[in-house]
Amino acid sequence: MKNIFRIALLLALGGALLQSCTKVNEPYYTVKQVTADTNTRTVLLEDYTGHLCVNCAPAAKSANTLQELYEGQVFVIGVHAGSFAKPDLVHYKPSLVADYRCATGNEWYSNSVFNIDQNPKGMVNRRAYNGKISFVPSEWNNAIIEALEQPRVAFMSMNNTFDADDKTVSTRVDTKFLTGLSGKVNLCVCVIEDSIYGGQLNSIAGDSTPIIKNFRFMHMLRGSINGTYGEEIADNPAANTVATKSYTFDFSSKSWVPGHCSLIAFISDATTKEVLHVIKAPVIRP
């Protein structure tokens, strides 16, 4: 039954990719809340997007479809960065004046190793696929399949506690290495937010819906809470080594809605930046 469901989603995904220059009809896409199944290999899909990009709405829909297709194994971060993510204060106001960029996303976008030269573009575990670190949406699914076939090297767990009085979240992330690794390993913990509504270009000239005025942005990167590429948690870790890190993040100065936010944590090779495992949990537990 699960295979039948995946085939149906793949057919839908293929249609979305083939129609990537056309408008996305309402409701644009639906989103299921998924959290990590820590008994399986997990994959990070980064969707580099922008509200001035006419192809980014279909790409966002494709990213969400892939997260549903590989429920509990694929986790999406929507990174608003690059020239198509800038506010437009001339041509499209007031629909596209919002600025969804953040320092973390800007630095990732500018990393020459990632070679993100356009929107939409994505990375799957920041590992090469067909000789490229970043690639267009039509390649995401096959890159995910390849990434999921890699051996699992770690088990991760995350426990979040939200204090409603002072609007802070405390998180503890435990990483158990299942095999010995060479080199340094970093842990990066990011805040992402769902259900932000705003304008999104969605067409070529003459399309009946050139701007989706209430597009639902999901998985939006708000920033990292422990540095652009995280911090070191292990150096040449042996099998069964456990690394534990705890953080507190303050929402009180932010306009973000904690109930719409999740923390997403991933470990990576400190040198190559390849993501080795990822986990996600809501800021406020249901």
Give the role of each language-model region.
Residues M1-F5, L13-L44, P286:
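Bacterial Sec-dependent N-terminal signal peptides
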Residues L17, T49-L52, A98:
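Secretory pathway export signals and precursors
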Residues S20, L52-N55, L187-V189:
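The N-terminal extracellular segments of secreted preproproteins, especially immediately downstream
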Residues K23, N55-P58, V124:
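Disulfide-rich extracellular modules and peptides
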Residues T30-K32, S62-Q67, N141-A147:
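Intrinsically disordered, low-complexity boundary segments flanking structured domains
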Residues V34-F84:
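Local sequence-structure signature of Cys/Sec-based thiol-disulfide redox active-site neighborhoods
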Residues G78-P286:
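Short, conserved sequence motifs used for protein processing/export or organelle targeting and
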